[in-house]
């Protein structure tokens, strides 16, 4: 009799737990830099993008309300891991979004895998997320170091820049960005003549720029991001480097231009998968975003990636019927084609890489610009299958043998 009662109690407890899970909100955690060098590039803007996606989807998935949380990882992997564990263990978070700073993204991806939830990296850059460190619980949405490094190195080489000096952020993202650009450079017959590593949030690039200047390289490649891009390009102009050497920022975004000005940044090449002024759909969404943004800025590609990633995630949650099993949700995301107003049609590969076209853009001159945020012109389109690393070259364990 006691054993029967115990079994019934266990069944009742399991049923109660299942009911509670079914009634609890689907929670989206946006984790990024809210207070340092990447805050203007993801920060509150990525949180807004996630909220807009939830609103546009209708506010519910699998019959459950959808909520958005956010946290500042301070660009520290240990802080990111602590936040992720608290979110997943105590706060009922089902998916973690954005993750600029690849070292943080690696740490969070591992926690998410252990807890069988979902991570969608939009701000994260390292292509290792879909390479040796791929996971059945992780999707890499917007860009990666392979796409930026290879595309820009090829474009610059075609314009005559054959000898390079790298100024590289000294963490996983910077190292990988330099490696990918170097790979394309060497394949195209170019040469690396030197390089230096810089800490994140560097305020004085003078010693690094002097080393680049004395190297005699035709191209000074900045493998840094966020506020470090703005600071290094400003100081390069002050040192007069652009008069004798080409300054190439391997990750140069729309948010860098206001701080530099069009006069200082005109002619700079960059690669984006999204630009607000591409078509009527991107313009309409971007204007809505700008009206609500804390800094009244137009969205960048990584913030757009948060929006699109949340939409596709919620579709998968509806398809699966819940958010509890992260692997099942990611499998559904891969099985369904992607389609949204910002990136258009695409798909998610077996290794977790989201595929879409990339665009080679150039910063306009002051005379070409028609006003605020009219900063770029599209030079060419890179088809999706060429924009990202071939599947069989990534060494992702999920696709071993392919």
Report residues per predicted region.
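Solvent-exposed, acidic/polar segments of extracytosolic/periplasmic ligand-binding ectodomains
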Residues: 26, 337-402
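Extracytoplasmic "Venus flytrap"
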Residues: 29-51, 71-78, 100-101, 167-175, ...
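Venus flytrap/periplasmic-binding-protein-like
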Residues: 73, 120, 127, 200-201, ...
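Extracellular/periplasmic periplasmic-binding protein-like sensory domains
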Residues: 235-308, 318-320, 324, 367, ...
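Periplasmic-binding protein-like
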Residues: 87-100, 120-122, 165-168, 216-226, ...
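Beta-alpha junction/loop-to-helix N-cap segments that form part of ligand/metal-binding clefts
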Residues: 25, 40-46, 56, 60-132, ...
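Extracellular/periplasmic Venus flytrap/periplasmic-binding protein
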Residues: 82, 127-128, 135-239, 276-284
